[in-house]
Amino acid sequence: GLSVSPDGEYWYLSMAHGMPYGHLYKYKTGSDEMVDRVELGLFPATMGISNATGLLYIVNFNLHGSHSESSTVSIVDPDEMIEIDRVETGIMPHGSRLLNNGLKHYSVAMMSGILYEIDAMSMEVTRTLSTEPKMKSMSNHMGHNMKKMDHSKMNMGSNKKDSMAKMNHKMPAEKPTWVYPHPKDDRLYVVNNGTHNVVEVDVKKWEVIRTFKTDKGPYNCEVTNDGKYLVITYKSAAKTGVWDLSTGKEIAKFNNTRKVTHGVSISPDSRYAFVSVEGVGKEPGAVEVFDLKTLKPVAIAEIGKQAGGIAFWKMAD
């Protein structure tokens, strides 16, 4: 993951692989001089910085861990580069974004199918929500498949009971990978990679209110600062979609120049979307630029292999 400090003076990089733990690195913008690093949890990934607390919140994705073990969100003081707390959430947490007022942090647990809200001040989980679309959620709220579980051959007196329960636990089909707030802080957009949709969550009511059926494998998303458009990367389809939030319709879809579309960052003036594309094999990665006014691709820059996280630094004359 990548993030830039609110004052634009520093940028941060998560290094997922370690022995066994990963690290967060701090660099000076402009010179790219390394300033410091701090060890975090297993596979630290996406991060965000609060405008209210100034703290950095980063999910420990734990990609190589068990699909039954909950992981955490690390909270870091980016000035001192010290981890000050860890908040337990769900299995394989992904996405890490805060409201524009900086008071609430949101992440999703890919293998739990849950959206988590953390109070940025108290550093505690305050609410959780299934990322299932509304109608499905009513009939199967938490993804458990209890009716299909055969208990007849279980030895309830042995220590195998817990492991059997885990075996019969149904992994959520949604597999959420991203969450992003609307500029007005009244809506959240959650990407369900496994079921090919994005759900819109009302922050106050804390419920799913709209579902956008997307192309295959949506992965990341971002909303323009003017609140008009939602840009979604389709990792499996190798495409990028632009959605009009007033109508809930997709108004443009671009074929990316190579496979494995990854992240997106939008310019502060809401004009351009910058999309990272990983590529495969020996292929270089790329950043592709799309004009959100004309709805046309305008530029491409080839970069290192497997381009992933992307963040916007600044606009200059």
Which residues does each predicted region cover?
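Predominantly soluble domains enriched in secretory-pathway, periplasmic, or organellar proteins
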Residues: G1-D317
